[in-house]
Amino acid sequence: MKSKSSRTRVAILGSGSIGLDLMFKVKASEQFDLKFVVGRNANSDGLRLARSCNVETSSDGLDFLKAHEDAYDLVFDATSAAAHKVNNRFFSDAGKFVIDLTPAKVGRLCVPCINLDDMGAEQNVNLITCGGQASLPLAYALKQAVDEIDYLEVVSAIASRSAGIATRENIDEYMTTTEYALAKFSGAKKTKAILNINPAEPGVRMQTTLYAYARYRDFDRVRASVADMVEKVREYVPGYRLVVEPLESQGRITIGLTVRGRGDYLPEYAGNLDIINCAALAVASHRHATARLGATQ
């Protein structure tokens, strides 16, 4: 087991479902020393659970992290898009590395299987949205295999119980940021993102369907590119898999996927939350390894 002095000191801002699942993931890793879980409501179930796991908590939010800025190196921000824009003013001034799990689009957009190695010098890394983390690998794989994408549409369906307050409050930002990222990573001329929240009980597993009108010369190349990308995603999201292999009909390409969560804290059907947390952990692990390498040179 690594000594605490060799671990990256971590604070989690936000004590909802994403923050708590991150807490369990961080605590299970020998790379990190979890210092704080911080929220806004002293009586919240999230902070109560964190305390029961022997993690120091506070309901003073950003003010607490300002007062303890020397005690952590990395922050996972699992609040809201609006809150993150305020939070990052302090983190930027304080030189703190931030992994943003909101659709605020303040920092550099990251999908680990696409551009993780480019994140080394960034102060703020934005993980776009859960639907983005699911669909963007496939959108990027398409880009590698076709001549041009005229239109790209992504429809994600998630269980109502996995859509917390922050998710519902950020719907507009979710659409805008996902569509922006789809255009950026695929080069598509026009993009559209749709999020369906399914109230069915028991909760249904996250599913995402990608539709594209694209010009290509070899559809086998499309299939191969998508298959290769799925394996890259599965390196950090084991529950990621295709349910509809690439299909072509009258110029339209269809690909379907599902994400089964790891079940660290969230139920397995909440793959939408698990995939963005797995991406966050991949970014944090990369930064930890980069920092350790720099310290030995």
From Swiss-Prot:
GO biological process entries: catabolic process
Enzyme superclass (EC): oxidoreductase
Reaction(s) the record says it catalyses: acetaldehyde + NAD(+) + CoA = acetyl-CoA + NADH + H(+)
EC number: 1.2.1.10
GO molecular function: acetaldehyde dehydrogenase (acetylating) activity; NAD binding
Active site: C130
SUPFAM superfamilies in the cross-refs: Glyceraldehyde-3-phosphate dehydrogenase-like, C-terminal domain (SSF55347), NAD(P)-binding Rossmann-fold domains (SSF51735)
Domain of life: Bacteria
Record has NAD as a keyword: yes
Residues that coordinate or bind NAD(+): S15, G16, S17, I18, S162, A163, G164, I165, A166, T167, R168, E169, N170, N272
Signal peptide start and end residues: none
Keywords: Aromatic hydrocarbons catabolism, NAD, Oxidoreductase
UniProt record similarity statement: Belongs to the acetaldehyde dehydrogenase family.
Protein name: Acetaldehyde dehydrogenase
Organism of provenance: Burkholderia pseudomallei (strain 668)
